[in-house]
């Protein structure tokens, strides 16, 4: 968690916002009390993806797939992502979100 207000303001200055699709997933997740990364973490993640352009990504803790889909938007073409989730009730929701995004 990022606590320093100046750091948060700096990170948020780079925020471009999300696609309407990601905004919808985030809204649904919050309505269902599913943890989603904070706005400044989303911004930092987008920056890191653009700066490092990883070809292999491992995400631990998929939840509903929000972070994975965010990273896939900023990953270079041909990048491969593996994401895992242990809470079985969320796995079908994540799969459905990947399907809705065309990332199945």
Predicted regions span which residues?
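A short alpha-helical cap/connector motif
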Residues: 1-104
């Amino acid at each position: 968690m990022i606590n320093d207000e100046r750091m948060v303001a700096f990170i948020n200055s780079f925020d471009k916002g999300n696609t309407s699709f990601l905004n919808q997933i985030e809204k649904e997740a919050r309505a269902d009390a599913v943890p989603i990364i904070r706005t400044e973490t989303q911004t930092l993640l987008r920056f890191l993806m653009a700066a490092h352009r990883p070809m292999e990504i491992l995400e631990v803790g998929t939840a509903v797939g929000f972070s994975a889909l965010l990273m896939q938007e900023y990953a270079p073409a041909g990048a491969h992502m593996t994401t895992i989730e242990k809470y079985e009730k969320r796995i079908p929701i994540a799969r459905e979100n990947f399907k809705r995004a065309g990332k199945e």
